[in-house]
């Protein structure tokens, strides 16, 4: 079996057996317990399998989304975990179009700090982030995503705790910025000083 065929089987079997129900802001624990996943947890599962089978790949973080680029026999392929059908993009023109949708003339453009990373339908017209991350940093993004849920529910202490965990795994401006904002809002909204 060639590498492309094996990759296709990995992608298909992962969706059949693990990635069962797309649910925005699902955790990796949710994925393992019930099959609920989002782009972060789905990409993490695929990344672990790609590691196991020796594929060369990179996880790409954008403002609202995470996906995987696989490098195979001199070509770049896309694994889009949120699309069980059509999510393995192999045609060079389709790969270029997919990547181009996240870039504006080669550079990303600005976004809101309290937006999540779990969407399937993403407006990419004003992206600012297009960054390669490793699996540890992806785990940090998982904590960030969970923190956004708490932030949007004005549960700032829980958001700050998750953002602190995220920063250990992935020190980034967006995580630090949301943590600072959560601390400020906890103080201004509830009069609680939660500096750590």
Across the structure, where does each feature detected by a protein language model lie?
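Secondary-structure boundary elements
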Residues: 1-30
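Hydrophobic/aromatic-rich core segments of domains that either
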Residues: 44-105
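TPR-adjacent "capping" and linker segments in tetratricopeptide-repeat scaffold/adaptor proteins
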Residues: 93, 99-106, 113-142
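TPR repeat positional signature
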Residues: 143, 176-179
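Hydrophobic/aromatic side-chain positions at a characteristic register within alpha-helices
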Residues: 151, 167-170
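Alpha-helical linker/edge segments of TPR/alpha-solenoid repeat scaffolds
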Residues: 183-196
């Amino acid at each position: 079996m060639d590498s492309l065929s094996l990759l296709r089987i990995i992608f298909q079997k992962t969706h059949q057996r693990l990635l069962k129900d797309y649910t925005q802001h699902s955790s990796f624990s949710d994925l393992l317990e019930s099959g609920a996943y989002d782009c972060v947890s789905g990409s993490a599962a695929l990344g672990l399998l790609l590691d196991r089978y020796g594929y060369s790949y990179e996880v790409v973080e954008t403002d609202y989304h995470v996906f995987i680029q696989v490098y195979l026999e001199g070509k770049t392929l896309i694994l889009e975990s949120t699309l069980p059908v059509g999510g393995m993009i192999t045609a060079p023109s389709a790969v270029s179009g997919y990547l181009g949708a996240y870039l504006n003339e080669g550079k990303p453009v600005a976004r809101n700090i309290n937006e999540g990373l779990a969407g399937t339908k993403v407006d990419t017209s004003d992206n600012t982030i297009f960054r390669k991350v490793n699996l540890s940093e992806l785990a940090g993004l998982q904590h960030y995503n969970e923190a956004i849920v708490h932030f949007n529910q004005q549960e700032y202490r829980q958001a700050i705790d998750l953002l602190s965990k995220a920063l250990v795994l992935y020190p980034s401006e967006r995580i630090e910025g949301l943590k600072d904002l959560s601390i400020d809002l906890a103080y201004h909204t509830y009069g609680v000083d939660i500096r750590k």
